[in-house]
Amino acid sequence: MRNKLKDLISRYTSIANELSQSRAELSKNLSTQIEMAMKRLNMDGATFKVELHQKTSQDETVRHNGVNVKYGPKGFDDVEFYLSANPGEAIKPLSKIASGGEVSRIMLSIKSVLKEGDPVETLIFDEIDSGISGEAADKVAKALKALSKEKQVICITHLPQIASLADNH
């Protein structure tokens, strides 16, 4: 029984390591694609990064790079998004720095990039127009329209540029 458990832990660790390596490789491409999508929404100076972290654990069952790590059914990586909204700003966790309007536009960028693999069918954007107007609003409106071809998009907006491209009101 002990040998079987050791074998299962070894197999899990091997698969989790492969998964972590794949995530690390894909996260670079994903970061680039999301940055490009953000630039299309007039967030020209923004930097976006997908970071992988592992939480340490007292449990010695699974080790990664010589450290005991917390593990689960999806491996041992924690994924966190980092953002610098403007050139020269330090990159920080998205959850701690973005304003409401920025979060909506970043989410629009993420959802636009991941739309084919995303199981979520309905997206709600609340005041995605906060802090923008003119050309930026036109770009956001077009991105929402493009996304609405794949998903149901519900958008709360005050700008006519965005409202005018909706199929239904």
Model regions and ranges:
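Conserved NTPase motor "head" modules and their coupling/switch loops across ABC/AAA+ ATPases, GTPases
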Residues: 1-124, 146
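C-terminal lobe/lid and adjacent interdomain/linker elements of RecA-like ASCE P-loop ATPase modules
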Residues: 79, 135-169
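Conserved D-loop-proximal element of ABC-family nucleotide-binding domains
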Residues: 92, 117-118, 130-138
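Catalytic acidic motif of RecA-like/P-loop NTPases
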Residues: 104, 129-130
